[in-house]
Amino acid sequence: PPPASSIRYAGVSPEIGLSETQQTLVRNGLRGEIEVQVDGQLKTPRDVIAMALLGAGEFGFGTAQLIVLGCLLMRKCHTNACPVGVATQDPALRAHFRGHSQYLINYYRFMAEGVRELLAQLGFTRFTDIIGRTDLIEIDADKFTEKTRHLDFSRLLCSGEFAIRRPASQFPSVTSSIAGGQHHLIEDVLDRKLIA
């Protein structure tokens, strides 16, 4: 089995992986073919907007949902010994569960309202219009410290068209997200006739 430290601390920041994925898909003319999903430490509407600006169109929430339902972050989910009954099948421990579905409904309602408010502040009405718009991200130099002032975010925040040194005219027409349905050219395959 892998060491416990690998289980607990392995991984990469979603910002880095998401930015690289977006740029690679755009450079290869494939961005309009898939929907990119991100998860990991998404808690607030600002987190959702930040991930969308970097290229995500779908979002996974895990820990936030557990906390809304009463999780105390005991890190015992995999042991079937959750003391508040969120992640256990033990009837005695499940009796401690105090969560309600309405708590999750409220969480997502407030999340959606917050995302709408931030979209309005950015001047957009549709969420899909901000997907992959790294040009809207501004670096706040006042937040830098002595150790962080030399960080260069240009490669992280560039759009895919300019991620490699080629004129934009050499790139196929791309969209930052799925603009329409996918076309797999399977309308006339033999299976359609055999199954019908």
For every predicted segment, state its role.
Residues 67-134, 138:
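Active-site or pore-adjacent capping/gating segments
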Residues 1-95, 99:
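Glycine-rich phosphate/ribose-binding loops and adjacent secondary-structure elements
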Residues 1-26, 161-196:
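Non-catalytic terminal/interface segments that mediate subunit docking, oligomerization
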Residues 7, 16, 34, 49, ...:
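Weak global preference for isoleucine
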Residues 15, 20, 33-35, 58, ...:
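Glutamate identity and glutamate-enriched acidic tracts
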Residues 93, 115, 127, 153-157, ...:
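Generic structural signal of hydrophobic/aromatic residues within well-ordered alpha-helices
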